[in-house]
């Protein structure tokens, strides 16, 4: 590549053509739904988003029944509220693994990704809110010679 460029103008044109931003296009399946997977801790959620009345179903239950704590319900609705799309999409999710908090985070991550697949214009809003970033924090492993990951066994001088 270095041999083919003879002037600074040519270098500028080559740099412009290579630095084109990726274009995000709508990704839908045969039924007109957007599909995405979300992860958090040990939980994995599979999420489908389609236009509808705002009904959210998690593991064949209404999300208010599956996630009884209001904090978890709020976590689930954050990407929808941030993108001003409340009541416009029906969301179906199946989630497995982990506890309720991790599952709520996984469904939130999946909803965010599926919304961007359905409506690519929402990507900037959801990215700014931090909903598209996979939370990589997981439980630290237990080490041998220790009671837990970092806690030592009780020490007795005598």
Swiss-Prot record:
Annotated Pfam families = Ribosomal_S9 (PF00380)
The protein in question is named: Small ribosomal subunit protein uS9
Instruction: Give the family this protein belongs to, as stated in its UniProt record.
Output: Belongs to the universal ribosomal protein uS9 family.
Which Gene Ontology terms describe the biological processes this protein takes part in?
Answer: translation
Which InterPro entries does this one have? Ribosomal_Su5_D2-typ_SF, Ribosomal_uS9, Ribosomal_uS9_bac/plastid, Ribosomal_uS9_CS, Ribsml_uS5_D2-typ_fold_subgr
Tell me where the signal peptide lies: none
GO cellular component labels: cytosolic small ribosomal subunit
Q: Coiled-coil annotation: which residues?
A: none
- What are the entry keywords? Ribonucleoprotein, Ribosomal protein
Check the record and name the PROSITE patterns matching this protein. Answer: RIBOSOMAL_S9
GO molecular function per UniProt: RNA binding; structural constituent of ribosome
């Amino acid at each position: 590549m270095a041999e083919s460029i003879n002037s600074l103008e040519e270098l500028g044109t080559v740099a412009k053509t290579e630095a084109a931003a990726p274009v995000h296009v709508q990704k839908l399946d045969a039924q007109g739904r957007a599909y995405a997977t979300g992860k958090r801790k040990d939980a994995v959620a599979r999420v489908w988003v389609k236009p509808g009345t705002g009904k959210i179903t998690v593991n064949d239950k209404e999300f208010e029944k599956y996630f009884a704590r209001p904090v978890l319900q709020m976590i689930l609705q954050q990407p929808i509220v941030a993108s001003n799309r409340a009541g416009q999409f029906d969301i179906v999710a199946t989630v497995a693994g982990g506890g309720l908090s991790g599952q709520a985070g996984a469904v939130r991550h999946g909803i965010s990704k599926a919304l961007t697949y359905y409506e690519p214009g929402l990507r900037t809003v959801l990215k700014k809110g931090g909903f598209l970033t996979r939370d990589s924090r997981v439980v630290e492993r237990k080490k041998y010679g220790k009671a837990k990951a970092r806690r030592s066994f009780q020490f007795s001088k005598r």
